[in-house]
Amino acid sequence: MTIYHFVGIKGSGMSALAQILHDKGFQVQGSDVDKYFFTQKALEEKQIPIMTFSADNIQEGLTIIAGNAFPDTHEEIERALELGLPVIRYHKFLGQLIDGYTSIAITGSHGKTSTTGLLSHVVGAIRPTSYLIGDGTGSGTKGAEYFALEACEYQRHFLAYKPTYAIMTNIDWDHPDYFKSVDDVFNAFETLGKQVKKAVFALGDDAELRKLSLDIPIIYFGFGEENEFQAKNVIKETTGTKFDVYHRGEFLGSFEIPAYGDHNVLNALSVIALCDYEGLPVEDVKKELKTFEGVKRRFSITEKANQVLVDDYAHHPSEIRATVNAARQKYPDKKVVAVFQPHTFTRTRTFLQGFADSLNLADEVYLCDIFGSAREKTGNLTIADLAHKTKGNHIIKEEHTEELLKYPEAVILFMGAGDVQKFQAAYEKVLDHEVLTEADLKKSAIN
């Protein structure tokens, strides 16, 4: 039996796919840079070997699954090609893997990961389900009937998939290094829609998705009256959100989610719509929606000292706006401080004013240096260009996160798609030191 070797195994999709193959009984290993990523925890728990990149890792008998961030000139891929080993790109392998399942591809400019996680949780509790989530979580469930997968639009990679269903959460202009306009993004989504076998579930409040023209049913969901599945009577509380769902004007049920913001209501509504279409019991769906704990790096909360720290993947103006609004709902009486690390120079330059406008919805804004992706290392833009447009003109360094101590009782949002977690980790050390120092002072006073 071949061994599957993942080039770039710490990538979120790659990590999830490796876990799926491992669960299905295949031998799996992989390589990546010698730096800790949150995705590797699950790999280590499953005892999947992780090596540092080296051509010496590539031996006879391997099947290579190559991450899309790595060109054919990468040393491991070059060695594999020299040896005549099969080399398959991640998205193409996944496209082959989902055949034979009732597959559900979740895509959209925003909300893919959260919706895939929610769908996997709900459907997986009702029927055997394999899933691949973009937070690095994957499961190859034995006897699975369904396969839920996050489908990324970047470079049209999702066109490798021919799923049974697709959920389209929204269309927005992102990845400006590849997509030239929102029309370009729309064309990619419509092309995917034409490959879907049974039905597409699409946000009907999205003007772009309303333009879809397909030969299969398009089931629209949203807040508007014209949607087949409509969310109404939304009640936003500090513990979560309640709402009623109507299907073609008929009351379907009252639902509750332990999540915040309109975007999470819409994510849940898409899942409810698909489950109803598939005939899954509505009471089971209600029950499972209540117990979803979220996905990694999406409004992940840590309470420390007298502050609330939130880790979030938001890296587009629309996502920042949604994250700030969610924080306002859950913590209406607290000050909201945004700590943002822009991801890629191209995206930052393209949406510079949009970033400023969304960040300024917070009470205070701190900016980290721009994170260049694997595709792009340099740019003429600097973080100062964005800082000049935001409240306070604050730039924060990893070595000086103590500035955030100025905001007791605040919610601090650490947002970005790069490695903004290191800023949170540095700040948590500052908080730990402050707590220890305070304890020492109290001890000295007693003595």
From Swiss-Prot:
<dbReference type="GO" id="GO:0008763">
    <property type="term" value="F:UDP-N-acetylmuramate-L-alanine ligase activity"/>
</dbReference>
<keyword id="KW-0436">Ligase</keyword>
<dbReference type="Pfam" id="PF02875">
    <property type="entry name" value="Mur_ligase_C"/>
</dbReference>
<keyword id="KW-0131">Cell cycle</keyword>
<dbReference type="InterPro" id="IPR036565">
    <property type="entry name" value="Mur-like_cat_sf"/>
</dbReference>
<keyword id="KW-0963">Cytoplasm</keyword>
<protein>
    <recommendedName>
        <fullName>UDP-N-acetylmuramate--L-alanine ligase</fullName>
        <ecNumber>6.3.2.8</ecNumber>
    </recommendedName>
</protein>
<dbReference type="Pfam" id="PF08245">
    <property type="entry name" value="Mur_ligase_M"/>
</dbReference>
<comment type="pathway">
    <text>Cell wall biogenesis; peptidoglycan biosynthesis.</text>
</comment>
<dbReference type="InterPro" id="IPR004101">
    <property type="entry name" value="Mur_ligase_C"/>
</dbReference>
<dbReference type="InterPro" id="IPR036615">
    <property type="entry name" value="Mur_ligase_C_dom_sf"/>
</dbReference>
<keyword id="KW-0961">Cell wall biogenesis/degradation</keyword>
<dbReference type="GO" id="GO:0009252">
    <property type="term" value="P:peptidoglycan biosynthetic process"/>
</dbReference>
<dbReference type="GO" id="GO:0051301">
    <property type="term" value="P:cell division"/>
</dbReference>
<keyword id="KW-0067">ATP-binding</keyword>
<dbReference type="GO" id="GO:0005524">
    <property type="term" value="F:ATP binding"/>
</dbReference>
<comment type="similarity">
    <text>Belongs to the MurCDEF family.</text>
</comment>
<keyword id="KW-0573">Peptidoglycan synthesis</keyword>
<feature type="binding site">
    <location>
        <begin position="108"/>
        <end position="114"/>
    </location>
    <ligand>
        <name>ATP</name>
    </ligand>
</feature>
<dbReference type="GO" id="GO:0071555">
    <property type="term" value="P:cell wall organization"/>
</dbReference>
<keyword id="KW-0547">Nucleotide-binding</keyword>
<keyword id="KW-0133">Cell shape</keyword>
<dbReference type="GO" id="GO:0008360">
    <property type="term" value="P:regulation of cell shape"/>
</dbReference>
<dbReference type="InterPro" id="IPR005758">
    <property type="entry name" value="UDP-N-AcMur_Ala_ligase_MurC"/>
</dbReference>
<keyword id="KW-0132">Cell division</keyword>
<dbReference type="GO" id="GO:0005737">
    <property type="term" value="C:cytoplasm"/>
</dbReference>
<dbReference type="InterPro" id="IPR013221">
    <property type="entry name" value="Mur_ligase_cen"/>
</dbReference>
<dbReference type="Pfam" id="PF01225">
    <property type="entry name" value="Mur_ligase"/>
</dbReference>
<dbReference type="InterPro" id="IPR000713">
    <property type="entry name" value="Mur_ligase_N"/>
</dbReference>
<comment type="function">
    <text>Cell wall formation.</text>
</comment>
<dbReference type="InterPro" id="IPR050061">
    <property type="entry name" value="MurCDEF_pg_biosynth"/>
</dbReference>
